[in-house]
């Protein structure tokens, strides 16, 4: 229930005038195996939603030799529109109840090294997002018999490519004053492959140090 998100209720309950619901079921199968210094894992799943059945998958592999380790993998994912995406509207924003799920495939490759009390790792990843939902600016847009001017519209016309790097190094000990310390750095850059003006899709932290 909500005061402004969802479909209008036949009989309001107090300050709640809108309602919406959806049921989601998930099924996942996963298998992993080891052979000498190699480890492989794969999974497949299905999500049953009001938008239909969505199939997802993931595969990864890892190789270790002494203190060295290398890994790579890929995974497909899906994100359902939130009720805010579907129903929120204001003087400057127009909702869209016809949104569909976002879909993305993420690839990653990386490695690490550990010796005695010290460890370090680095990982590169790329996410190919399709039908990404965001608020898109339209100078003029006709919806049915209405023409709206200068508003943000909830749409999913963005094709988004995201590249990132994550690196970390640290120290760990069972004794002493300082038992552990870790330094990590992350870099992220995003390129929108659709020529539209969006509100928040490119609002992210490019560099992160902790």
Regions found by a protein language model. Give the residues of each.
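Surface-exposed extracellular loop regions of Gram-negative outer-membrane beta-barrel proteins
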Residues: 2-6, 13-58, 61-108, 124-155, 175-185
């Amino acid at each position: 229930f909500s005061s402004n998100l969802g479909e209008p209720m036949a009989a309001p309950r107090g300050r709640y005038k809108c309602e919406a619901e959806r049921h989601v079921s998930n099924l996942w199968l996963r298998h992993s195996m080891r052979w000498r210094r190699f480890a492989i894992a794969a999974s497949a799943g299905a999500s049953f939603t009001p938008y239909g059945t969505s199939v997802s998958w993931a595969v990864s592999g890892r190789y270790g030799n002494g203190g060295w380790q290398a890994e790579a993998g890929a995974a497909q994912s899906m994100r359902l529109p939130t009720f805010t995406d579907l129903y929120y509207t204001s003087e400057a924003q127009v909702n869209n109840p016809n949104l569909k799920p976002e879909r993305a495939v993420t690839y990653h490759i990386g490695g690490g090294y550990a010796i005695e009390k010290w460890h370090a790792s680095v990982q590169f990843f790329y996410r190919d997002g399709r039908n990404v939902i965001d608020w898109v600016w339209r100078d003029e847009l006709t919806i049915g018999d209405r023409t709206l001017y200068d508003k943000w519209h909830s749409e999913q016309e963005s094709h988004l490519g995201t590249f990132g790097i994550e690196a970390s190094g640290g120290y760990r000990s069972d004794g002493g004053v300082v038992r552990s310390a870790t330094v990590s750095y992350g870099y992220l850059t995003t390129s929108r492959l659709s020529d539209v003006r969006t509100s928040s899709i490119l609002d992210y932290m490019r560099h992160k140090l902790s």
